[in-house]
Amino acid sequence: MLSNLTAEQKNSLQTMQAVLGLAADMAHGMVTIYLPCEDKKFVYVYKQEQPRTQRGSVRPDLTGRRIRLVEEPLVARSLQKNMPVRGKREWDLGVFNTMEVFPLRDGRGRSYGAISFETSAPDEIIIAQSLELLSNMPQSLVDNEHYKRMEPSDGIMVVDPNKLIIAANNRAKHMFDVMEIPQLIGCRTNDVAINWPLVGMVMETGTAESKEFNM
């Protein structure tokens, strides 16, 4: 497993592990990193995180466990094909979650593992941003206070380069509904009703910032 990885691949895993919990919180779903075992019939759970932003029952943490590959057909397909895979997974009897699996690739495009997002209410844009965080997080920022774990009371919005809000979680929508902005997606952060100049500043500098405000 780890002994077969290059230094680049190991460094990437260490960085991802540091912010895996935050990615789970953002995606409102369980996030798991899988690595191939020497025995091709098994896969190794390198790290697994449950979201703090979602209340309810959670599964046992499988970190450090070996799992038969036949029990994870979506993971097997992603590892074999070096491509993203989407499907359903039974959470409980008759209850299914959406599971999306993405290959982990190094700088040469070689697949050395897979990462899955499992959630009952997937938002493709927010999952994509969570994956972006994991894939491109600089090691120097993993201890930055702005990248701490989230809570159920935290709102999430995804803003495009034009300051257009293209995705938001239910908490963010509720927060702005109280401010009489019932349709948050499609608004701009520089609209008069929202007026968040901090977003534009972060886009210009590429540096995370924070500011407290009353709603």
Describe each model-derived feature in a short phrase.
Residues 2, 18, 43-55, 76, ...:
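N-terminal membrane-sensor/transducer module of prokaryotic signaling receptors
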